[in-house]
Swiss-Prot record:
Subunit comment: Monomer.
The protein's name: Phosphoglycerate kinase, chloroplastic
Organism: Scenedesmus fuscus (Green alga)
Signal peptide extent: none
GO molecular function: ATP binding; phosphoglycerate kinase activity
Length: 36
């Protein structure tokens, strides 16, 4: 089942390997600042 980070507890993670996928594809302005 799909969970968000806020749904996880220590018991969910204890003794397990965790893979975190992060989407860093965000729009940037000409000064390289996130615009949205």
């Amino acid at each position: 089942a799909k969970k968000s980070v806020g749904d996880l507890t220590k018991a969910d993670l204890e003794g397990k390997r965790v893979f975190v996928r992060a989407d860093l594809n965000v729009p940037l302005d000409k000064e390289q600042k996130x615009t949205d």
